[in-house]
Regions:
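Short, conserved active-site loop motifs that form the nucleotide-linked donor/cofactor pocket
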Residues: 24, 45, 136-137, 206
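Active-site-proximal region of nucleotide-activated glycan assembly enzymes
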Residues: 3-63
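Conserved catalytic-core segment of nucleotide-activated headgroup transferases in glycan assembly
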Residues: 50-144, 152-154
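Acidic, glycine-centered active-site loop in nucleotide-sugar glycosyltransferases
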Residues: 178, 193-206
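Short, contiguous acidic/charged loop-to-helix segments that flank catalytic cores in large enzymes
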Residues: 83-88, 112-115, 162-165, 184-189, ...
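A donor-sugar binding/catalytic signature common to diverse glycosyltransferases
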Residues: 1-20, 146-193
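Active-site-proximal binding-pocket segments
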Residues: 139, 165-167, 200-203
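Conserved small/polar residues in nucleotide/adenosyl-binding loops
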Residues: 209-218
Length: 218
């Protein structure tokens, strides 16, 4: 595309627009980019009327996670984040642990990937600095099928999104499983993916632009 193989070129999906000067359009929607975004893009932003992304559902299998197998009481509140480690940062983790601290009978589940040791260390260190026992942090291993992964999301009462790199596929899966989700809305494409998906699903009560609001509501 950099050599202009077509008279009109557009990009879509991915992390954001490419910035390549030979690209004419970047496909977006009313929510995934803020109103003033055109000031910062070399391409013409082409906003579809509702959403830039649509799916027709997901296959879901039988879950292989149970609260009792993880030592979680039946009346506990379970928070879950299914993002990879590179989407975490100290500020997001601090906020997640503050939420956990405000809900005494709660647990935080997170997915284990290749970077799980570093992520576990960050989560445990932050939890301990907030006076939270590491027993309330439970790593969840990878599964063989995406259908099982989606089914396992059902163990959560609330899914906590990451910021400034939101979920995308994981957000769609969460919505498909009808699980409440809390996200923070930023000014960049990657920080507004969950926002546009939730808005298009008619959900507006758990999208925030301010950290304190995110923490207080939860």
């Amino acid at each position: 595309m950099a050599v202009k193989v077509a008279p009109i070129q557009a990009t879509w999906l991915g992390w954001d627009a490419s910035g390549i000067p030979t690209i004419d359009y970047f496909i977006a929607d009313p929510y995934v980019l803020p109103e003033n975004a055109q000031d910062y893009y070399p391409h013409k932003i082409w906003r579809l009327p509702q959403t830039y992304l649509a799916v027709d559902g997901f296959e879901v299998a039988i879950p292989n996670l149970k609260r009792e197998d993880l030592g979680i009481p039946s009346d506990a509140v379970v928070y879950f984040t299914a993002q990879r480690g590179y989407k975490y940062n100290p500020h997001t983790v601090r906020l997640q642990m503050k939420i956990l601290k405000e809900v005494p009978k709660s647990y935080f589940l997170f997915k284990k990937f290749g970077d799980s040791d570093l992520l576990s260390e960050l989560l445990i260190d932050t939890a301990e600095s907030e006076g939270i026992s590491s027993d309330r942090l439970i790593p969840i291993g990878e599964v063989s099928l995406e259908e099982i992964h989606r089914a396992n999301l059902g163990i959560a009462d609330i899914v906590l999104d990451t910021y400034p790199y939101n979920g995308a596929t994981t957000t769609l899966e969460t919505l498909w499983m009808c699980i409440p989700m809390v996200t923070r809305v930023g000014q960049q494409f990657a920080a507004r993916n969950s926002y546009t998906m939730m808005m298009n699903a008619g959900i507006t009560a758990v999208s925030y632009t301010h950290l304190r609001a995110h923490e207080t509501e939860t």
